[in-house]
Amino acid sequence: MPIRVAIVSPEQEVWSGDADMVVARTTDGDLGVLPGHVPLLGLLAPGGTVRVKTGGREISASVDGGFISVTHQGVSILAETAKLT
Protein backbone atom coordinates (compact mmCIF):
# COMPACT_ATOMS: atom_id res chain seq x y z
CA MET A 1 0.00 0.00 0.00
CA PRO A 2 1.74 3.21 -1.12
CA ILE A 3 1.90 6.49 0.74
CA ARG A 4 0.76 9.78 -0.84
CA VAL A 5 3.59 12.36 -1.07
CA ALA A 6 3.67 16.06 -2.00
CA ILE A 7 6.78 18.24 -2.22
CA VAL A 8 5.86 21.92 -2.39
CA SER A 9 7.51 25.33 -2.15
CA PRO A 10 5.76 28.72 -1.95
CA GLU A 11 6.13 29.05 -5.74
CA GLN A 12 4.95 25.63 -6.93
CA GLU A 13 4.20 22.00 -6.34
CA VAL A 14 7.52 20.34 -7.20
CA TRP A 15 6.30 16.73 -7.19
CA SER A 16 3.37 14.68 -5.96
CA GLY A 17 2.39 11.06 -6.27
CA ASP A 18 2.34 7.70 -4.55
CA ALA A 19 5.54 6.32 -3.07
CA ASP A 20 6.86 3.21 -1.38
CA MET A 21 9.23 5.18 0.90
CA VAL A 22 10.34 8.74 1.63
CA VAL A 23 13.70 9.71 3.13
CA ALA A 24 14.17 13.31 4.26
CA ARG A 25 17.09 15.02 5.96
CA THR A 26 15.87 16.77 9.10
CA THR A 27 17.67 18.73 11.79
CA ASP A 28 17.65 15.47 13.83
CA GLY A 29 19.13 13.36 11.01
CA ASP A 30 17.72 11.30 8.14
CA LEU A 31 14.10 10.25 8.55
CA GLY A 32 12.67 7.28 6.66
CA VAL A 33 8.91 7.09 6.22
CA LEU A 34 7.06 3.96 5.12
CA PRO A 35 3.29 3.49 4.75
CA GLY A 36 1.70 3.28 8.20
CA HIS A 37 4.32 5.51 9.86
CA VAL A 38 3.17 7.28 13.01
CA PRO A 39 2.18 10.94 12.52
CA LEU A 40 4.93 13.49 13.15
CA LEU A 41 6.14 16.96 12.28
CA GLY A 42 9.85 17.57 11.62
CA LEU A 43 12.11 20.47 10.69
CA LEU A 44 13.95 20.01 7.38
CA ALA A 45 17.70 20.58 7.47
CA PRO A 46 19.06 23.57 5.52
CA GLY A 47 20.53 22.40 2.21
CA GLY A 48 19.02 18.94 2.66
CA THR A 49 17.56 16.40 0.29
CA VAL A 50 14.37 14.42 0.00
CA ARG A 51 14.38 11.05 -1.75
CA VAL A 52 11.15 9.40 -2.85
CA LYS A 53 11.23 5.73 -3.83
CA THR A 54 8.38 4.70 -6.09
CA GLY A 55 7.92 1.75 -8.38
CA GLY A 56 11.60 0.81 -8.47
CA ARG A 57 12.84 4.32 -9.24
CA GLU A 58 14.05 7.16 -7.04
CA ILE A 59 13.11 10.82 -7.27
CA SER A 60 15.40 13.30 -5.53
CA ALA A 61 14.75 16.91 -4.60
CA SER A 62 17.03 19.46 -2.99
CA VAL A 63 15.21 21.41 -0.29
CA ASP A 64 16.20 24.30 1.89
CA GLY A 65 14.35 24.84 5.13
CA GLY A 66 10.74 24.04 5.90
CA PHE A 67 8.87 21.12 7.41
CA ILE A 68 7.94 17.51 6.85
CA SER A 69 4.47 16.50 7.97
CA VAL A 70 3.53 12.84 8.24
CA THR A 71 -0.16 11.99 8.73
CA HIS A 72 -2.31 8.94 8.08
CA GLN A 73 -3.23 10.59 4.75
CA GLY A 74 0.37 10.97 3.53
CA VAL A 75 3.60 12.97 3.64
CA SER A 76 3.86 16.69 2.91
CA ILE A 77 7.23 18.35 2.36
CA LEU A 78 6.71 22.09 2.82
CA ALA A 79 10.03 23.69 1.86
CA GLU A 80 11.16 27.29 1.59
CA THR A 81 12.85 26.30 -1.70
CA ALA A 82 12.69 22.97 -3.52
CA LYS A 83 13.71 21.62 -6.92
CA LEU A 84 14.10 18.20 -8.47
CA THR A 85 17.68 17.06 -8.96
Curated annotation (Swiss-Prot):
Signal peptide (from-to): none
Location(s), subcellular: Cell membrane
Entry annotated with the keyword Cell membrane: yes
Entry keywords, A to Z: ATP synthesis, Cell membrane, CF(1), Hydrogen ion transport, Ion transport, Membrane, Transport
Entry membrane topology: Peripheral membrane protein
One term of GO molecular function: proton-transporting ATP synthase activity, rotational mechanism
Main location: membrane
Gene Ontology CC: one annotated term: plasma membrane
Taxonomic superkingdom: Bacteria
Protein family per UniProt: Belongs to the ATPase epsilon chain family.
HAMAP family xrefs: ATP_synth_epsil_bac
Quaternary structure annotation from Swiss-Prot or TrEMBL: F-type ATPases have 2 components, CF(1) - the catalytic core - and CF(0) - the membrane proton channel. CF(1) has five subunits: alpha(3), beta(3), gamma(1), delta(1), epsilon(1). CF(0) has three main subunits: a, b and c.
Physiological role: Produces ATP from ADP in the presence of a proton gradient across the membrane.
Protein name stated in the entry: ATP synthase epsilon chain
Gene name linked to the record: atpC
